[in-house]
A protein has these predicted regions:
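Alpha-helical transmembrane segments and membrane-interface helix-loop junctions
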Residues: 1-205
Length: 205
């Protein structure tokens, strides 16, 4: 189990890096989208290539970021049910879901997506729109994204099994359900509460 947990940590580290890199694609998509809109409205200038790069970036954010979302345990779940269950029960449910749904789906989508990508790459498939972009980078995102998801699903399965069998004390490698933004918001709220208490104490004197 020790070797598997080391593999899990390696996968987590890679997906953490991919996720943070993907965040910059969101900024790039916003800048390009704003630039396209500004040029179109102000100068009546536009191109199919600039519009299609937005779609590519949008697809890349979702397909490359899917593993990071799973790492952060940020996928949608029915909180009012899972919050009432023990960590062990939740870990068992997660492990079953990963084995029955996530891993098989990822393998199927990789097998279906790879031939589509290779065909587009071999034929040099281009957009049907005038001045559009080549298509294979977009098709590559399908097998690549599900490969990332498959790797992270395997990592999560290792962690759940390790927790269930008593090899780790936590089923998650990161803090459950709290993003950096949420932690910052909690810190700011606590600081505001302290400030109000100081003001109230000052008035009491």
């Amino acid at each position: 189990m020790g070797a598997l947990l080391k593999l899990s940590r390696l996968i987590d580290t890679v997906n953490e890096w991919i996720g943070k890199l993907t965040m910059w694609l969101v900024l790039a998509a916003v800048i390009i989208s704003a630039g396209n809109a500004s040029l179109r409205k102000a100068f009546n200038i536009g191109s199919n290539a600039s519009l299609e790069i937005q779609w590519y970036l949008f697809a890349a954010v979702f397909m490359l970021g899917v593993g990071y979302v799973m790492l952060r345990n940020a996928h949608v779940r029915i909180d009012f049910i899972s919050s009432k269950l023990s960590k062990r029960t939740n870990a068992i449910i997660d492990a079953i879901g990963i084995v029955v749904f996530t891993i098989p789906l990822s393998i199927i989508m990789i097998n279906l997506g790879w031939p589509v990508f290779m065909r587009a790459f071999d034929t040099g498939e281009m957009s049907q729109n005038a001045g559009g972009l080549i298509r294979w980078p977009m098709w590559a995102l399908l097998p690549l994204g599900f490969s990332i998801l498959l790797a992270q699903a395997s990592s999560e399965l290792i962690k759940r099994v390790a927790f269930i069998t008593g090899h780790t004390s936590e089923p998650f490698s990161v803090e459950h359900g709290k993003s950096e933004a949420e932690l910052l918001a909690e810190e700011l709220a606590a600081e505001a509460a302290r400030h109000e208490q100081e003001l109230a104490a000052g008035k009491a004197r």
